[in-house]
Amino acid sequence: FAKTAKFVACGFDRLDRLPLAAEDRKKVVGNPVRSPIKAVRDKPYPELSDTGPLNILVTGGSQGARLFGEVIPQAIASLPEAQRARLTVVQQAREEQLEAVRAAYRAAGVKHTVDSFFSDMQDRLAAAHLVIARSGAGTVTELAVAGRPAILIPLGIAMDDHQTANAEGMVTGAAADVVPEPKFTAEMLAPLLLERISNAGVLKARAKAAWQLGNPNAARDLADLAEQAAGVTGKRDA
């Protein structure tokens, strides 16, 4: 189909298996995002210093919450006490893990909100200084549009390792770190996390880099491209 399509719209610059003959018709338009996420883009990155309060948002979805519930509390518990005292962690966890994850944070003296679902995710994202997440296309797109730095853990069983490909732009754009799932342990995460939360300047720079990668108008751009392909002219509601 790509060989005969007038345009090939894609969410990210990397598009594997695209026929060479269609390469010059590839158009990177991004992925549409919900209005509440676009609204986060217009809000400033939360105030942050090297020693002040820092908010971490952990979202894993059904394919990531179990691993995150095991590794992340353990990694955070191993941080120096002064760093743990700064943190507020908002974490999505599986229902059967909720009490264990909460208990781990209580024992570590870390302020936390742990639940299996958050209906106000846009508000949680707006308050976050750093996000730890999988790298599904929707998640990566929302992080970029919102302008939030991240530590991304691609789903190991994802077909063709497409979650690593999704994260590529955030990594090359200096907006995120990527940790392969087999290497995602508390012993590996703790020093990386400590390095990130100890330097407010780096997190702010990464937030700006993520923001610059985001396209809040992907839905409009895709519609424009469809109309162009169809030869439609004239005004259309935004």
Residue positions per predicted region:
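Active-site-proximal region of nucleotide-activated glycan assembly enzymes
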Residues: 1-42
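Donor-nucleotide binding loops and adjacent catalytic segments primarily
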Residues: 42-131, 164-168, 172, 179-189
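Acidic donor-binding loop of glycosyltransferase active sites
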Residues: 126-140, 148-149
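A short, well-ordered alpha-helix in the C-terminal region of glycosyltransferases
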Residues: 202-216
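C-terminal alpha-helical cap of glycosyltransferases
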Residues: 215-238
